[in-house]
Amino acid sequence: MPVVSLAQLLESGVHFGHQTRRWNPRMSQYIFTERNGVHIIDLVQTAQLMDEAYNYIRTASEQGKKFLFVGTKRQAAGIIAQEATRCGGYYINQRWLGGMLTNWTTIKTRVERLKDLERREESKALDLLPKKEASVLRREMAKLQKYLGGIKNMRRLPDGVIMVDQRREYNAVQECQKLNIPIVSLLDTNCDPTQVDIPIPANDDAIRSIKLIVGKLADAIYEGRHGQLEADYEDYYEDYEEYEDDYEGAEGDLDLDSANEEESLEDNNEEE
């Protein structure tokens, strides 16, 4: 039985690509036709590649391997956080900081700083400080939580990355390639399938499409870890249209630690 049916893919709008003038010719093998100036993705291939991705991720999860979810676009951010949390994965859903993986040693020090601030907050130690000093530390903690909260429990580099929009997450792709970390990615018709290990041709702009694909890949991780899916998982698949209005993307700068920003983090301004 396939992981996802053609009917589910159609219903979620997975087949809608970009306008024909915005395509990447390397995606031609995954394009079924063109309609009203928009490319239509071949859902038969999408379903087949979903099976391949699901089996790969489930097997890797059975072996104890860990996955990082990456999706910083507004439509994907909320889904990435919820699905990664649900299956026990890690996630980056705000801005990708330069060196997130290739400079993991430095990033890890910022994660430890976040944990320390959270411990001090939980123990009420911050309440004992002067109000101004406590306020500064709480602002620092909030910013660290925003950008690094999804990898707070990640003790080492991930064994694989699940990504939404390879084109947007170009810096993440480069770092994965340098470290030989496998990438499973949703690819719209403007993406490059040669940059990832398992491509999943799909609409990476529609919330329902992202939810369906990312949700199934999260299922694979959960099944690999626990042997079966929870009975109430079907109830979990709510309509994610609410994220389009309610979820706010990342804003502001990346001054995570003004004291040593230059040596610890690079501002990634890669935008679509």
Swiss-Prot record:
Name listed for the protein in its UniProt record: Small ribosomal subunit protein uS2
Matches recorded under NCBIfam families: rpsB_bact
Keywords from the named record: Ribonucleoprotein, Ribosomal protein
Gene Ontology molecular function, alphabetical: structural constituent of ribosome
Pfam families for this protein: Ribosomal_S2 (PF00318)
Gene Ontology BP annotations: translation
Region (Disordered): 244-272
Top-level division of the source organism's lineage: Bacteria
Underlying gene: rpsB
Species the sequence originates in: Trichodesmium erythraeum (strain IMS101)
HAMAP family: Ribosomal_uS2_B
The family this protein is said to belong to: Belongs to the universal ribosomal protein uS2 family.
Alphabetized Gene3D superfamilies for the sequence: Glucose-6-phosphate isomerase like protein, domain 1, Helix hairpin bin
Any one GO cellular component localisation term in the record: cytosolic small ribosomal subunit
